[in-house]
Amino acid sequence: MIDWKNIKLDLIKFLKDEVEKTGLKKVTMGLSGGLDSAVVAILCKEAFGDNLNCVLMPSQFSSQSSTDHAIEVCEKFNIKYEIISIEPMVSGFIKNMDEDRLRIGNFSARMRMSVLYDVSSREKSIVVGTSNKSEILLGYGTIFGDIACAINPIGQIYKSDEFEFARLLGVPESILNKAPSAD
């Protein structure tokens, strides 16, 4: 049986230690409304309090329920957030190409990374990632996109194990029960 309470404490300490090494005090992360980003947001809130900035970055390909779930996490845990639509960037890109979902998805991930690093610069903060171990081992991510970050606290947790951890952290049932997506 996995000792999630100690893992939680270890990850919070890891986050604090790694950010302290940079000389910064704030963190920025993307919040999609999915399980991984909800888990990381809760860990970061416990580690950094109000020095956490979550960014929601919808596009025309994002589901409204994902944005709603991200806001639900922010409201439940009193996390400040901002919504920055990547729609203008994505629309400008896809108007001159075919509707290749993989290319659009990868482009969208890279636009989100650019937005996160810009917000991170503005806030004088460090970007925290949300990729779990299963995604990393399977190569399920976009190079220079959603896998780009300075630190990744859940990079050693398999997705199959993450649900139990998420319950301990208090991730809303609406997120625990929804099907995974690449939103």
Where are these regions (language model features)?
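Mid-to-C-terminal catalytic subdomains of enzymes
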Residues: N132-I136, I143-D183
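ATP-dependent adenylation/nucleotidyltransferase module used to activate substrates
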Residues: M1-G139, A166
